[in-house]
Curated annotation (Swiss-Prot):
It is a multi-pass membrane protein. The chain crosses the membrane at residues 19-38, 71-93, 100-119, 139-161, 181-200, 204-226, 269-291, 350-369, 389-411, 426-443, 456-478. It is found in: Cell membrane. GO terms for cellular component: plasma membrane. The keyword Protein biosynthesis does not apply. Belongs to the UPF0324 family. InterPro entries: UPF0324_pro. This is UPF0324 membrane protein NE0724. Keywords: Cell membrane, Membrane, Transmembrane, Transmembrane helix. It holds the Pfam family Cons_hypoth698. PANTHER family: INNER MEMBRANE PROTEIN YEIH-RELATED (PTHR30106), UPF0324 MEMBRANE PROTEIN FN0533 (PTHR30106:SF1).
Length: 487
């Protein structure tokens, strides 16, 4: 292990994983302060649905909890608060602070411009809202269009304006943005847990079972394919198998460290993970909506088992949630509550993430005592699992259970807490999703696939020929017939 990992608290101020926890907890504590009469939320801006013919600042933006504020003031405060917090984190993580600040500001402006455009009624409004906005036509794409538009803009920058992309890379941190949003998503899950405790329990338990069954199939099949068909070395097959079977980049890096693989391997696999995650993000939400519009929880769970980065999974889950709810309202006459399909995807993904440390530990033991046959060369302990464990999961669980305990203290406390949290949670989480989409596009460079033909071919075959079909089958077995609450 390196020096950074010699203490349990190492990295708490220097890693994106931990800073996702700190930023999420800061926002959660701002919400909790409402219980003592402090109003520290409500300043967050959020876009509103609007039409081209009636464009105005007041029409496209609004304050999430302070209606007396001008929307421009809410947007300015939103920028100042998040700029201060992210720059503090960037300084602590030893980023180039000046470059991060400039890049963050550019990303923030682009994100909000795209978000506002994506909320134009011709793009977003459902068929039931046409009369409300005076529309004669509309695409009824829902909020998912904003995410897709952000991704497309990012891809254009990442592949056609590469100097700009390289400059923005210091601020384009999709994994950090999405992990921060997921930590705060814990409060939304807390609300859902109180509203539908039985359903949450069933979803969590079936999610654990589905994840375990799927993973026990994924890794050995992909590893065997890599070794016997593609004739990869043991370390290459192991790193790629973990990357595509567990959770992408984190698993590839953890596995490489555990088995002491060649340094280039996790880098190659990470590139493949990011690029293929982009394809999954674009294809799978619409595909699942089309093939099984009446199985929302199956689709969400299958997405969580298939998409291999936290950022892309959360982003794809948000898009799937929007697409399936819009489709159900338009074609089935059912209005599902927001967030439950996304939660099915994230819950499954989080169980997979929690397995990283355990699997890295198992592989380390196998490599030391079986593959390398050099006992005593490496000392494996519980601290290894701790340092591999995704810390944002701890933040997510802490916020989730803390909200439940605080809200359970009385109906008045629950109402106060919910009002204060809702003023920040939804807009903040969605803004982080938007930042994730545009950042994924910016860091995705298709030209980097050159020279990785064998690994790329194996990754594609394993993903679409093994992982996706098995994931959907397992999700179908464990989640078939489960439905989100109806409004």
């Amino acid at each position: 292990m390196n020096a950074m990992n010699d203490k349990w608290y190492s990295g708490m101020a220097r890693t994106e994983d931990w800073w996702a926890v700190w930023l999420g907890l800061i926002m959660f504590m701002a919400s909790v302060s409402s219980l003592w009469g402090w109003e520290l939320t409500g300043w967050m801006a959020k876009p509103d649905t609007w039409v081209w013919e009636k464009f105005s600042i007041e029409g496209v933006l609004k304050s999430s909890g302070k209606p007396e504020w001008h929307p421009a003031l809410s947007l300015l405060v939103t920028y100042l608060v998040f700029t201060a917090l992210t720059c503090l984190a960037a300084w602590s993580m030893k980023f180039d602070l000046k470059q991060f600040f400039i890049g963050w500001t550019i990303l923030f402006i682009m994100t909000w411009v795209i978000w506002i455009i994506g909320n134009e009624a011709h793009f977003k409004a459902s068929v039931y809202e046409m009369d409300k906005y005076g529309l004669s036509w509309g695409l009824s794409l829902g909020s998912g269009f904003s995410y897709l538009l952000a991704l497309l803009v990012g891809l254009v920058i990442g592949n056609f304006f590469k100097n700009t992309a390289r400059f923005l890379n210091e601020a384009a941190k999709p994994e950090w943005f999405i992990k921060t949003a997921i930590v705060f998503l814990g409060i939304k899950i807390g609300v859902m847990s109180i509203e539908a405790a039985g359903f949450i329990t069933e979803l969590v338990m079936t999610g654990v079972a589905a994840t375990f069954v799927a993973y026990m199939l994924f890794w050995p099949i992909v590893y065997a394919l890599g070794r016997r068909v593609f004739h990869l070395s043991r370390d290459a097959a192991a790193v790629l198998s973990s990357g595509i079977s567990i959770c992408g980049i984190s698993a590839a890096i953890a596995t490489a460290g555990a088995i002491r693989a060649r340094p280039a391997l996790p880098a190659f696999v990470s590139i493949l993970v990011v690029i293929f995650a982009m394809f999954e993000l674009i294809i799978l939400p619409g595909f699942y909506t089309a093939i099984a519009p009446e199985q929302p929880i199956v689709n969400g769970s299958a997405l969580g088992l298939t998409v291999k980065t936290d950022g892309a999974d959360a982003a794809a889950g948000a898009m799937l949630d929007e697409l399936m709810r819009a489709n159900a309202e338009a074609n089935l006459g059912i209005v599902w509550k927001e967030g439950w399909i996304l939660m099915a995807s994230l819950t499954t993904k989080i169980w997979i993430d929690m397995f990283i440390g355990v699997w890295a530990f198992v592989l380390a033991l196998v490599w030391v005592y079986k593959v390398e046959r050099k006992p005593g060369q490496s000392k494996i302990g519980l601290m290894e699992i701790w340092h591999r464990f995704p810390k944002f999961v701890l933040g997510y669980l802490l916020v989730w259970f803390s909200y439940i305990m605080l809200a359970s203290s009385g109906s008045e406390a629950a109402e106060t807490l919910h009002k204060a949290a809702a003023a920040v949670e939804g807009p903040m989480r969605n803004m982080m999703f938007m930042l994730t989409f545009i950042s994924i596009g910016i860091i995705t460079d298709f030209s980097k696939l050159k020279g990785m033909g064998k690994l790329a071919l194996l990754y594609a075959i394993a993903l679409f020929g093994i992982i996706a079909p098995i994931a959907y089958g397992v999700a179908w077995i464990f989640h078939r017939g489960m439905m989100p609450p109806v409004l």
